[in-house]
A protein has these predicted regions:
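Alpha-solenoid helical repeat scaffolds
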Residues: 4-7, 72
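Alpha-helical junction/boundary sensor with strong preference for TPR arrays
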Residues: 6, 10-13, 17, 77-85
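Acidic, Ser/Thr- and Gly/Pro-rich intrinsically disordered linkers and low-complexity segments
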Residues: 10-42
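Residue signature of alpha-solenoid helical repeat architecture, marking inter-repeat boundaries
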Residues: 40, 45-47, 87-88, 92
Length: 108
């Protein structure tokens, strides 16, 4: 699974991005910038997205507590991650996760 295989690299990328500019995402019309972004932060983005998708799958399986924990991992551990959207821009893992976390959830 993506999460297991790339967590260590994603954590290092998250730490580096937190020190530089967590909000940075490339202009969608710059292929070179997008390619560089994916090369430098690919694991961070993929692992953050995987935690969100895992949460959605767990919700569908009727496991709301496990789903909330997965959303929490995405938001709190991969705060700086982004998901490329079909419109050419990026969605923030943090913002998407925050919309899915229930107000009663507390980060363990």
């Amino acid at each position: 699974m993506v999460i297991d295989k790339f967590t260590e690299v994603a954590n290092a990328q998250e730490a580096a991005k937190l020190k530089s500019n967590c909000d940075y995402k490339p202009a969608a019309n710059s292929k070179q910038a997008v390619d560089n972004f994916n090369a430098v932060y690919g694991a961070l983005n993929d692992v953050g997205a995987a935690w969100l998708l895992k949460g959605i799958a767990l919700e569908a399986l009727g496991k709301p507590d496990e789903a909330q924990a997965a959303y929490g991992r995405a938001v709190y551990d991969y705060w700086c991650g982004y998901i490329k959207n079909p419109y050419g821009g990026y969605w923030s893992v943090r913002i998407l996760g925050e919309t899915l976390i229930k107000p009663s959830y507390s980060n363990p």
